[in-house]
UniProtKB/Swiss-Prot annotation:
Transmembrane segments: 41-61, 120-140, 153-173, 177-197, 277-297, 310-330, 379-399, 415-435, 450-470, 485-507, 527-547, 550-570
Protein name: Autophagy-related protein 22-1
Gene3D superfamilies reported in the protein's UniProt record: MFS general substrate transporter like domains
Record membrane topology: Multi-pass membrane protein
UniProt keywords, alphabetically: Amino-acid transport, Autophagy, Glycoprotein, Membrane, Transmembrane, Transmembrane helix, Transport, Vacuole
Entry's localization field: Vacuole membrane
Organism: Aspergillus clavatus (strain ATCC 1007 / CBS 513.65 / DSM 816 / NCTC 3887 / NRRL 1 / QM 1276 / 107)
Glycosylation (residues): 90, 445, 591
Pfam families: ATG22
Purpose: Vacuolar effluxer which mediate the efflux of amino acids resulting from autophagic degradation. The release of autophagic amino acids allows the maintenance of protein synthesis and viability during nitrogen starvation.
Keyword Cell cycle in record: no
Family, as annotated: Belongs to the ATG22 family.
GO biological process, one term: autophagy
One GO CC term on file: vacuolar membrane
């Protein structure tokens, strides 16, 4: 069984071992094998994030609904022998190479008594998936910090998520609703597992032999990582630079500014491990994406597409699920349990009642953080901007894939190549923007504004096709399939910069000592907003019958954060954060928590979410 414990490898004979901070803590020095166990889960799940969520799941959902749908005007099947778009020659053109639905009529499917555009169906599904993911992340954030729940939840989410992807091979067009349910499950497990995975990194760093040696040399104790968000921040599974996070440290007792500009050994090691994990995950995703395209091309030469146009896509999702499952098993063997503090059962009651109290504690803690943040003007302005911007980023990705398939009539293999283009550009952007910022001597908020301005090019370019003269040309304004590839490069480059610099800029505004709690709020804002945009675009598609109409909403959504980011005064926000930290420190002993130290309040694992 996947959850059966594997005897851990013995630690090196000369390894330094620190004192445990609570009963049952595993302070065994971190081994290279354990770090690779951490890497392997990123290699496993990032494939589903890029190849599944970012590419083939939206296409599969839309195609499943399309094969079940009818044309709005004539009620004829959207695809198949009886459809107006049936290919000549008895429809022998391979489905993966065919541009389905060449007519302009809207393809709709019945759902709860309503006629919904098949592209809207995919957008609504992902909107619901992100909402469920956000609720799950917040609810499980406190529970995963205790006992062996961390590894158990990681393996559980990985197992359920990978199986949900593999089960798509059995989802025929007749069961398209069940396909939507599997998407919700898969997306929820993906985000939740990454949050739990990130919570391992501070523990691995804390027990690394090199850190113990450095601390012994300096004559210092290792800070309590649970009461400081610093290592949580550097350990986040982010996609870029974390500069600006380490201006202050929060020791176990009291707050103090750093007395040195040098980066701490923990920060250096954490950043090194995190960056390598991100790189390995992206490389795995690109590899599987290439394999998926080859698989699609090979299957297009067989009779499978004649059975169902979605069958090759479903085989790709089977491959993705097998990959996720296989590397999760490796993670289970190589990654130690690293249990957290034991649950307090002194008050009696069943364990499930304690778990319910932990869920309530997570929500209550998040609300307390909201009340503190509401008193910080610069934080409020930035979070409003981030609310809009993160929603725009999530909406553009899903809309672009569906636009390429339904409006540009691109084949599935071409859409896969588009995804690879955006992924490689995102990897480049993570390294490029720090260089651009240094060369142009830009402040962090100016870099963010520049990224947003470039991001705005995508919807504006798509809206050019509404100009009659441009429409008459038949090119420019995303009228030809090749035009979307340069925009895919722009999307990748900009996303890499925004994800890193927004997180870094927010770090300057946080009260020292409350980092993890505020990053929980940051992540909740991200996940809590990302379901709105896809739902609105889905409504617009239903109203107009065109995915292109969503560009109007996206253009407004992208441009709104620019004045807000410009309004944020980083220095003033930093001073407000310091003042708030002093105020919180004075009331430190008055706000003790039922499940942990006062300084741990509102942290949870959600703080480690990218």
């Amino acid at each position: 069984m996947i959850f059966t414990s594997t005897p851990p490898a013995p630690p090196p004979a000369d390894a330094q071992q620190r004192q445990p901070r609570y009963p049952g803590e595993d302070t065994t020095p971190t081994s290279r094998r354990e770090i690779w166990g951490w890497y392997t889960y990123g290699i496993a799940a990032e494939v589903f994030a890029v190849c599944g969520v970012g590419s083939f799941l939206p296409l599969t959902l839309e195609q499943l609904a399309r094969e079940r749908g009818t044309l709005l005007s004539s009620h004829l099947p959207c695809v198949g022998p009886g459809s107006p778009s049936a290919a000549p020659g008895n429809g022998t053109t391979p489905a993966m190479l065919r541009r389905d639905g060449l007519g302009s009529d809207q393809c709709v499917v019945g759902l709860f008594g309503l006629q919904i555009n098949t592209a809207s169906f995919a957008m609504y599904t992902f909107s619901l998936a992100v909402l469920v993911q956000a609720l799950t992340l917040i609810s499980f954030s406190a529970l995963a910090d205790y006992e062996k729940n961390r590894k158990t939840l990681l393996l559980t989410f990985g197992l359920i998520g990978s199986v949900s992807s593999m089960l798509f091979v059995f989802i025929s067009p007749r069961l398209y609703i069940l396909g939507a349910i599997l998407v919700v499950i898969g997306v929820t497990c993906l985000g939740s597992s990454f949050v739990v995975l990130n919570s391992f990194l501070p523990v691995l760093v804390a027990n690394d032999p090199s850190i113990q040696t450095a601390r012994k040399t300096e004559g210092e104790e290792l800070p309590h990582l649970d009461s400081s968000g610093e290592y949580t921040r550097s350990g986040s599974f982010n996609r870029g630079d974390n500069r600006g996070f380490d201006d202050y440290v929060a020791p176990e007792h009291g707050l103090k500014p750093k007395t040195t500009d040098s980066t701490s050994p923990e920060m250096q090691l954490s950043t090194k491990i995190s960056s390598k994990g991100v790189g390995l995950g992206y490389c795995a995703a690109v590899l599987v994406q290439v394999l998926s395209i080859l698989l699609l091309f090979t299957l297009s030469k067989t009779s499978l597409p004649k059975i169902s146009g979605t069958l090759p896509l479903r085989f790709v999702l089977l491959l993705v699920g097998i990959w996720w499952f296989s590397f999760t098993v490796v993670t289970r063997r190589w990654l130690r349990n690293r249990p957290g503090p034991p649950l307090d059962t002194s008050k009696g009651g069943a364990r499930w009642r304690i778990w319910l109290r932990l869920v309530g504690f997570a929500w209550k803690s998040l609300w307390k953080t909201v009340k503190v943040a509401a008193k910080l003007r610069e934080v409020v302005i930035f979070l409003i901007a981030w609310f809009l911007l993160s929603d725009a980023m999530a909406t553009v990705s899903g809309t672009a894939i569906l636009f390429a398939r339904t409006e540009l009539k691109m084949s599935t293999t071409a859409v896969g190549l588009l995804s690879i283009t955006a992924t490689l550009s995102g990897m480049t952007g993570a390294f490029l923007w720090p260089v651009v910022s240094r060369r142009l001597k830009l402040k962090s908020n100016h870099t963010i504004m520049l990224c947003i301005a470039l991001f705005e090019i995508i919807p504006l370019y798509g809206m050019l096709a509404y100009i009659p003269l441009v429409k008459k040309w038949g090119v420019i304004g995303l009228q030809q399939p090749w035009e979307i590839f340069p925009l895919g490069i722009v999307h990748g480059l900009v996303s890499g910069g925004l994800s890193s610099y927004c997180r870094s800029f927010f770090g300057v505004l946080i009260p020292p000592g409350s980092e993890a709690a505020f990053y929980a709020l940051y992540a909740a804002t991200d996940k809590g907003s990302s379901f709105i945009g896809p739902a609105v675009v889905g409504v617009l598609i239903d109203a107009t019958g065109q995915v292109r109409s969503g560009f109007f909403f996206i253009a407004v959504l992208i441009v709104l954060p620019i004045p807000l980011i410009w309004m944020v005064n980083a220095e003033k926000g930093r001073q407000e954060g310091l003042a708030m930290a002093e105020m919180l420190e004075k009331s430190h002993g008055e706000n003790s928590s039922e499940f942990g130290h006062p300084s741990e309040e509102a942290e949870g694992l959600l703080a480690r979410n990218p």
